């Protein structure tokens, strides 16, 4: 059963970054996965960090800029999740699909916040 998603977006982005970290610890250790995993870790954590910055911004312009960065990092997270090789592990594949869906949902939320589709 899938766990309920936090309503608070700051918490939701933190949970996403935590879930990505747990996932990366479990993937097969290949050279490609090591590199893609590093990029995924950076992008997933950057979503939440930039959202915190957006909430603390001093102007609307800065708020929108930070939300655009969040959207970009969400797209990057989905991209690197796509590249990671889970081997033949069905549970890892299921987890990857769920994480990709969450990255896409975060992207859509930030799209809405900045007023683009």
Could you say what each language-model-derived stretch is?
Residues 1-53, 57-117:
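Short, C-terminally biased terminal segments at protein or domain edges
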